[in-house]
Curated annotation (Swiss-Prot):
Name under which the protein is recorded: Indole-3-acetate monooxygenase
Family, as annotated: Belongs to the HpaH/HsaA monooxygenase family.
This protein's UniProt keywords: Monooxygenase, NAD, Oxidoreductase
Conditions for induction: Induced in the presence of IAA.
Molecular function, one GO term: flavin adenine dinucleotide binding
Catalysed transformations (reactions): (indol-3-yl)acetate + NADH + O2 + H(+) = 2-hydroxy-(1H-indol-3-yl)acetate + NAD(+) + H2O; indole + NADH + O2 + H(+) = indoxyl + NAD(+) + H2O
Function: Involved in the degradation of the plant hormone indole-3-acetic acid (IAA). Catalyzes the first step of the pathway, the conversion of IAA to 2-hydroxy-IAA (2-OH-IAA). Can also convert indole to indoxyl, which spontaneously dimerizes in the presence of oxygen to form the blue pigment indigo.
Amino acid sequence: MMNKLSKMEFAAQDKAVDLDALCQEIRERACAGEFDNQAYVSQDIIEKLKKIGVYRALVPKRFGGEEWSPRQFCELIETLSKADGSVGWVASFGMSPAYLGSLPEETLKELYQNGPDVVFAGGIFPPQPAEITDEGVVVRGRWKFSSGCMGADIVGVGISPLKNNEMQGLPRMAVMPANKAKIEMTWDTVGLKGTGSHDLVVEDVLVEKKWTFVRGEPSKLSEPFFKYPSLSLATQVLTVVGIGVAAAALEEFEKLAPGKASITGGSEIANRPVTQYEFAQADAEFQAAKSWFYQTMDIVWNEIIAGREATAEQISDMRLACTHAARVCAKVTRKMQMLAGMTAIYTNNPFSRFVNDTNVVTQHAFMGDATLQNAGLVSFGLKPAPGYL
């Protein structure tokens, strides 16, 4: 059901890395509750994500990166998410070059001077007032939902630059070493608990202007990746977490069904007509949603590689495919849990984890009902809300 990534892809980066073995380790540690109980992904796993290229995949080659396509990156996140949704979610922020590419080129050279494996975490909303000084901006405030912050090298926070109590220009993101921010461990959720999406607190940190940028501002870098719609990519890397988890749910049920009989003496689950029907239907819906998700990505990437700009309709299709896939994946995992019976209701049962994780994906603002409304606006030739495209 999954697109298999070859171990050979990582041989040039680190001969000791075996993606299959890493995923098995992640799965075992996640099922034992390690990441959920501590509310973050352990640092040794972050280091192994570096080794398989998660954080250099999208960095330009001139800075030591790999310049993968968006699809290649999403397929890797899908594979990791199949092992554990929280690890996949944290790894998805390897897409950070899409944001950081808006920094000045000289700043990027400084950022990657010791190598491209830089782990970024962000707390964007709400943008906090930041006083402009001759040296830069003074940043203070609290930001929520900073996924992966416990393992980050640098963090970015949303600011509204002020001078004489008046806002100056558009909101920006200020980037600083992670040790300049305090982490308050507030993340206690029903799903994706291991992402460690805690609060960032910053107290009067001076950030030079060259380390700030307008989020969503087009990058001045020439590589094709920086022509790809960054907000769409930010949505896709989260959606594909749900795709990976749903794939895991389907595979887990395929293994369970042939040997599981009812405690009341009924036939094995796999021999029940209703199970056969429901599983086939769920699998078809999943495969269709996943295929459309990747198809819309390929269409836009091919346009960019050919030197053309993607149309509003093509970009809107990517956003709509994300919302659709996220919801289908949540539906599929719930169906697998229902078919698995009473054993699937326990907290540490894999099916409970699958359901909780995919439902959290659907709660993200990028996958909200507004996406459907905006997609409808584009379909009718009308202007969508700012930030949709």
